[in-house]
Amino acid sequence: MSRTGVPICFISETGNDHVGNIILRFMRDNHISTDYVNVFPDGKSPVSLAFLDDNSDAEYIFYKDYPKQRLDVIYPKLEEDDIVVIGSYYALNPVLREKVLELLDQAREKKAIVYYDPNFRSSHKEEAIKLAPTIIENLEYANIVR
């Protein structure tokens, strides 16, 4: 979308390391604002790797070393009909939940459109029952669900 001139804000976090620098450079090269990306000085950028077996089924390996303070950003000011995309475990993570709710509450107040892609991975299946209320809450905020 940013390549077509649509202004994009990406809210996330990364480490102050080589991986984080590659991500930030890619975003800037593609005209995506990095104003709302928290670059944490402690911890490393998370890395996810996918390996395909003989049946082309993916097996994922996740490497992460997060700091205690997470998603330390001031959110952009949303306006009516802005589109907020949330999803995956990031939108469910109890450590980030308060910050995610802050964004969702602002979206609701300003009448922004919330697109929710649960993208629930089997790597979190043991937490499914515990996370169900959060998934339902995200569905309640959503205008569009993938």
PLM region spans:
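Gly/Ala-rich phosphate-binding loop of Rossmann-like dinucleotide-binding domains
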Residues: 2
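A general structural motif
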Residues: 5, 80-81, 111, 142
